[in-house]
Amino acid sequence: MNKTTSSHSPIHVIGGGLAGSEAAWQIAEAGVPVILHEMRGVRGTDAHKTESLAELVCSNSFRSDDATSNAVGVLHAEMRLAGSLIMRCADLNQVPAGGALAVDREGFAEAVSAAIADHPLITVLREEIRGLPPKDWDLAIIATGPLTAPDLAEAIRAETGADALAFFDAIAPIVHADTIDMDICWHQSRYDKVGPGGTGKDYINCPLTQEQYDAFVDALIAGDKAGFKEWEGTPYFDGCLPIEVMAERGRETLRHGPMKPMGLTNAHNPSVKPYAVVQLRQDNALGTLYNMVGFQTKLKYGAQGEVFRMIPGLQNAEFARLGGLHRNTYINSPTLLDHSLTLKSRPGLRFAGQITGCEGYVESASIGLLAGRFAAAERKGVSPVLPPVTTAFGALLDHITGGHIVSDDEPGKRSFQPMNINFGLFPPLEPGALTRPEGAKRFRGKEKALAKKQAMASRALSDCASWLDQAV
């Protein structure tokens, strides 16, 4: 079909997955022409099976659709408010999945592909882009996802630096800070070391007796483990071994590795030396999330909850993210990108989707949505208006572009790791925002936690609507 002309020069989007498709749609809906470059049809990947745009490689679930008390459900709702193509096509191709939003994967991808093909301001070119965009592409978005082709990945590495591009996630679980039992745990850095920006009390420490340690090691070794996808290979290297692999190398390995007790004194029982210690380190600037240091794992999710709650102090832990180790090409976004997702070293070039370090279908699409809106605003000569950090959009964007705390003692060379949306990324509620429901006999525990989530969700949707009224 003939494409409608526009007075604006086109914006180029590289990658026709969830993020790239959403970015292209948002740009076009803003009245700016866009050229979407997708290599499938010319060159396939090890995971994709079709040439459709927005093909779902793994699950067909977009997870919870509850916008009243679930962070991903809030993100769904915000995307719908913003006119998301991905959410529109998901809703049109929904299949029964309880409280979750799951889709017919073929119908979904076909719907996205058709909408993109039919839009008068979008042109799809089936070609592989082997390097960074040429200089005459003054505005471009790279949204090539976790399976970025080798030539482009190498070009990104050359532009950003040798340590700025990761090809595998070594993900340790992340715990909501308010679910850690501080009657058992205590704050202390090893040897009370202060370090850059530290206080000497930068870690939460969980003590284990020998009996508890032995039981924990046995459970780790016996735990149900996930295998690698055929196309992932087995990327173990010593700086980033799964915790259960370390345990299998010898019963004392963990005590002399990530669970070593040296330099730590139990504040609750100073005269008794712990046999082993699990350390958790602050993961976000808000201090609402803590990651389990050195606990990258291939245990299946169900096993992780059972095994890690054996650790004293984590018996009631709620996890913002569980651990994993898998193929996932992504950049060190907090260092490389500004808050509008633009590469600091190259104005006009944005990154979007999973390559920025977000995790999950809707998270990737939402960052594509933001990148598309920001690029369209820039094309129109308007400064992008950032979403408030109180929204799901803003909380995720803030984590990617600067909310993560960088640490020098992370296993391997990186500390920024991909993250799903969760309420731990949102700023705390204002004092007094939670009040006891009228007639309620108690307001603590699960009731208070639910009320907190509901208040955060309500605030997010209200602030998102206000932001959309301002944004171009």
Curated annotation (Swiss-Prot):
PROSITE patterns, alphabetized: GIDA_2
Required co-factors: FAD
Entry-linked Pfam families: GIDA
One GO term of the biological process aspect: tRNA wobble uridine modification
EC identifiers of the protein: 2.1.1.74
Binding site for FAD: G15, G16, G17, L18, A19, G20
Record key words, sorted: Cytoplasm, FAD, Flavoprotein, Methyltransferase, NAD, NADP, Transferase, tRNA processing
Record bears the keyword Lipid biosynthesis: no
Cellular component terms (Gene Ontology): cytosol
Catalysed reactions, semicolon-separated: uridine(54) in tRNA + (6R)-5,10-methylene-5,6,7,8-tetrahydrofolate + NADH + H(+) = 5-methyluridine(54) in tRNA + (6S)-5,6,7,8-tetrahydrofolate + NAD(+); uridine(54) in tRNA + (6R)-5,10-methylene-5,6,7,8-tetrahydrofolate + NADPH + H(+) = 5-methyluridine(54) in tRNA + (6S)-5,6,7,8-tetrahydrofolate + NADP(+)
Compartmental location: Cytoplasm
EC main group: transferase
GO molecular function: flavin adenine dinucleotide binding; tRNA (uracil(54)-C5)-methyltransferase activity, 5,10-methylenetetrahydrofolate-dependent
Keyword Cell membrane in annotation: no
HAMAP family: TrmFO
Function: Catalyzes the folate-dependent formation of 5-methyl-uridine at position 54 (M-5-U54) in all tRNAs.
Protein family according to the UniProt entry: Belongs to the MnmG family. TrmFO subfamily.
Name this polypeptide is given: Methylenetetrahydrofolate--tRNA-(uracil-5-)-methyltransferase TrmFO
Organism taxonomic ancestry: Bacteria, Pseudomonadati, Pseudomonadota, Alphaproteobacteria, Hyphomicrobiales
Name of the gene encoding the protein in the UniProt record: trmFO
